[in-house]
Amino acid sequence: MKRGEFEHAIRAAGAVLGVNQVLVIGSQALHATVHGALPDEAARSVEVDVAVRGDEEGRLADLVDGSIGEASMFHATFGYYAQGVVESTAVLPEGWEGRLVRFETPATNGVVAWCLEVHDLWISKAIAGRPKDIEFCAALARRGIVDGKTLEARLVMVRDLDPRVRHAVEGRITSP
């Protein structure tokens, strides 16, 4: 997803939801941190994962999905979409809320996207462990976008993680 597409999806999510702040927890959160071209592993994604703080039951997430989500008229028209999610979708290190990165441009029309900080994002993706997440994490490491010591510290901040998953993530940190 290109930056202009990301801005459009954020603007559309704010309009559909009637809010001026959204939370971005997927790979497109990189737009708040990486200036310029995203790694191919992030740019090829056609969805932005959008949540609204406090929407634990997912009612607003469902509204996003139905209005501008996958297979919607928005998706058919523009070729990208917003995926409605809830905060608990991502497993994150303690304190992540205090590290969110603000993204707002004139093109978001007053809607602020609070995006995961890149190390918190990396940890979340590494824990998810799907092939596309592992590729994403490796690309960030190769490009020097993340710092290994910071990743190690963030992993320690993840509570109640299955020891096998923790071990796998530790391996991804030390050998990107």
Tell me what each language-model feature is.
Residues 1-176:
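Compositionally biased terminal segments of proteins
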